[in-house]
């Protein structure tokens, strides 16, 4: 296989802020391609400062291991993921991009879309939400009114959380989902969640710190709304821990290291009775297209990266 890559840095339509106060105006990412004969597969790895992942560090790893990445004799994507997992053990973002490109390449070689390779049929697919980042209440209302949508994910974790939802609810009957990004204490969550339920919120994503399992166990028993794990469920090893602490999991392809482990996480979550969501890390159309092929297997989806970014780099979604 032949490896190529391209760094990109796409502006957000609006500055994007979450509960820890981080604000982003651009999303840097690395696009990768694997070429074999007349076929080419594409993948994407967003650079996330919170995880100490930069475009520059990913490029350095690609060049360091280029020969090993290219020499693999492709027979099936799962084998390539295991190979990459050992070759790049500390870089799940880059493994994800290469795994994504491999599945895309393999599907083109077989003449099948990814969802068919996963033996699913294209029916009953959920609609993505549209995320509204933390801002002043007036600006959050303006963002929502500028983008009419049936499902909104609203970032919370402020002193004004209830006022934010009350203000937004005055302007729409759309479905609301709340993402606290681990920004609440157990006491705050116990106080806020019943109020949010009365305002028509559908579920809460990651209310507490990722390692606050004791608090989550209490919240799981008391919450009138379903609770979804994000930061608490990064890899395959985390899925089982979420039982009796969360009602569902939000899988991020980038964080779990790709399509291959995400397939296994979904299978395990179904066996354990957990609801399943796949979430975005502000990927462009390239990474979002990979998420889209999982839609028939999901209860919910958050793949709004192309809606949040001000520029498009690909077509097909």
Model-derived segments and spans:
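Metal- or metallocofactor-binding catalytic centers and their adjacent structured scaffolds
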Residues: 35, 40-109
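Metal-dependent enolase-superfamily TIM-barrel catalytic cores that perform enediolate-based chemistry
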Residues: 112-223
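Short Pro/Gly-enriched beta-strand edge/turn motifs at strand-loop
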Residues: 10-18, 200
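Conserved, mostly hydrophobic/aromatic
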Residues: 31-32, 38, 98, 111, ...
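Flexible C-terminal active-site loop/helix
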Residues: 1-12, 24, 37, 279-317
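N-terminal amphipathic alpha-helix/helix-capping segment at the start of soluble metabolic enzymes
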Residues: 1-8, 19-29, 33, 82, ...
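Catalytic alpha/beta core domains of metabolic enzymes, predominantly
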Residues: 211-305
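Hydrophobic faces of well-ordered beta-strands that scaffold small-molecule active sites
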Residues: 41-43, 126-132, 150-154, 176-180, ...
């Amino acid at each position: 296989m032949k490896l190529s890559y391209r760094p990109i840095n796409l502006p957000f339509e609006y500055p994007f802020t979450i509960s820890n106060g981080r604000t982003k105006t651009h999303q840097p990412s690395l696009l990768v391609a694997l070429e074999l004969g007349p076929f080419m597969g594409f993948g994407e790895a967003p650079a996330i400062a919170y995880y100490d992942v930069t475009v520059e560090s990913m490029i350095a790893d690609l060049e360091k291991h280029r020969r090993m990445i290219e020499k693999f004799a492709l027979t099936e994507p799962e084998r390539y993921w295991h190979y990459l997992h050992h070759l790049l053990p500390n870089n799940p973002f880059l493994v994800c991009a290469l795994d994504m490109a491999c599945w895309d390449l393999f599907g083109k070689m077989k003449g099948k879309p990814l969802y068919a390779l996963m033996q699913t049929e294209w029916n009953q697919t959920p609609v993505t939400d549209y995320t509204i980042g933390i801002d002043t209440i007036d600006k959050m209302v303006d963002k929502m009114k500028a983008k009419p949508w049936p499902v909104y994910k609203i970032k919370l974790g402020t002193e004004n959380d209830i006022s934010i939802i009350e203000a937004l609810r005055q302007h729409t009957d759309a479905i609301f989902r709340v993402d606290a990004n681990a920004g609440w204490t157990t006491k705050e969550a116990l106080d806020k969640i019943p109020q949010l339920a009365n305002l028509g919120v559908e579920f809460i994503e990651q209310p507490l710190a990722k390692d606050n399992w004791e608090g989550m166990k209490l919240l799981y028993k008391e919450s009138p709304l379903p609770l979804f794990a994000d930061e608490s469920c990064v890899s395959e090893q985390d899925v089982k821990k979420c039982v009796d602490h969360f009602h569902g999991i939000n899988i991020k392809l980038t964080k779990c290291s790709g399509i291959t482990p995400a397939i296994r996480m979904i299978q395990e979550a179904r066996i354990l009775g957990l609801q399943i969501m796949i979430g975005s890390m502000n990927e462009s159309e390239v990474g979002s297209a990979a998420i889209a092929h999982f839609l028939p297997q999901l209860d919910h989806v958050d793949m709004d990266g192309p809606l949040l970014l001000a520029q498009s780099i690909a077509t097909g979604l």
